[in-house]
C-alpha cells in the first residue's frame, strides 16, 4: 500500500513539474523519491539472527516549491519496517521535514526544519546522513542578515529532531545559537586582489534542557559553548583553525 503511494506521488511530482515549469510566473515544483528495500534470509554459516518481519523498507519523498524569493517544502518518510542497522526510534510513516523560507539580497528567514553548521561543526552541526540513519535537523526559526558586504550574521532557535514515530518527534532541549563571519577580502575592495584570503568567525550556542538530571547527578539546565575560527588560503595552501 505504501509502495503504491510513493509510485503515484512520483508521477504527480513529474507531471506537476512539467506543467508549472513551463510558466515561471506560477512558480516551480520539484521533487524526488528514494526507496530502499531489504529481504532477509537466514544464514546458517554465521548464525545471524533473522528479524521477525523478514522485509525492511525505508522510503523518502521530497516535494519543493519555489517562486521568486519564496520556498517551501516537505519530506514524507516511511519506515515499514525499519532497515536492519537503522535506529529503532525510526518507525511508521508521516511527515519528517517541512519548511518555508524567504530570502532577499541581505536577509533570509526560515521557519520549520533546516540543516546548518557553525565553522567545523564542533559546537553546532545539524545534518542528515541517511545511510547511517542520522538526522538531527533543527525545528524552529533561523534568520540570516548581511548588514554590509563581507559580514554575515546568523541566529536560530529551535528543537532538534529526536526520533520518528509516524511523524517527526523533537527532543525536549531548546537550542539557541548565533554565528558571525567576516570575510576580510570582501570587506575592503582593495583586498580583493590579495593572494591571501582570510575569514574570521565566531559562534555561541546554548541549550536548555530539564531532562539532564538523574538520581546520581544534578546537571545544569543551561549549557553554553563558544568558539572562534580563522580560515586562511594562499594559492594552494589552506589553513583552518578553531578554538572552542
Features from the language model and the residues they span:
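Surface-exposed extracellular loop regions of Gram-negative outer-membrane beta-barrel proteins
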Residues: 115-126, 131
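Bacterial Sec-dependent N-terminal signal peptides
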Residues: 1-30
Amino acid at each position: 500500500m505504501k509502495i503504491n503511494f510513493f509510485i503515484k506521488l512520483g508521477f504527480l511530482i513529474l507531471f506537476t513539474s512539467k506543467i508549472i515549469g513551463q510558466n515561471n510566473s506560477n512558480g516551480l515544483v520539484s521533487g524526488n523519491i528514494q526507496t530502499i528495500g531489504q529481504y532477509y534470509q537466514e544464514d546458517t554459516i554465521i548464525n545471524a539472527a533473522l528479524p521477525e518481519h523478514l522485509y525492511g523498507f525505508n522510503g523518502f519523498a521530497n516535494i519543493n516549491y519555489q517562486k521568486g524569493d519564496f520556498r517551501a517544502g516537505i519530506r514524507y518518510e516511511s519506515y515499514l519496517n525499519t532497515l536492519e542497522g537503522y535506529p529503532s526510534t525510526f518507525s511508521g510513516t508521516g511527515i519528517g521535514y517541512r519548511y518555508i523560507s524567504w530570502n532577499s539580497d541581505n536577509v533570509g528567514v526560515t521557519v520549520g526544519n533546516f540543516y546548518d553548521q557553525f565553522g567545523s561543526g564542533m559546537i553546532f552541526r545539524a545534518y542528515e546522513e541517511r545511510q547511517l540513519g542520522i538526522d538531527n535537523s533543527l525545528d524552529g526559526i533561523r534568520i540570516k542578515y548581511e548588514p554590509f558586504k563581507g559580514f554575515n550574521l546568523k541566529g536560530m532557535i529551535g528543537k532538534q529532531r529526536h526520533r520518528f514515530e509516524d511523524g517527526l518527534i523533537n527532543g525536549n532541549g531548546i537550542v539557541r545559537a548565533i554565528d558571525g563571519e567576516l570575510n576580510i577580502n570582501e570587506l575592503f575592495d582593495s583586498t580583493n586582489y590579495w593572494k591571501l584570503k582570510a575569514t574570521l568567525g565566531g559562534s555561541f550556542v546554548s541549550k536548555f534542557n530539564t531532562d539532564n538530571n538523574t538520581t546520581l547527578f544534578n546537571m545544569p539546565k543551561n549549557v553554553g559553548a563558544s568558539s572562534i575560527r580563522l580560515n586562511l588560503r594562499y594559492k594552494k595552501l589552506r589553513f583552518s583553525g578553531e578554538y572552542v
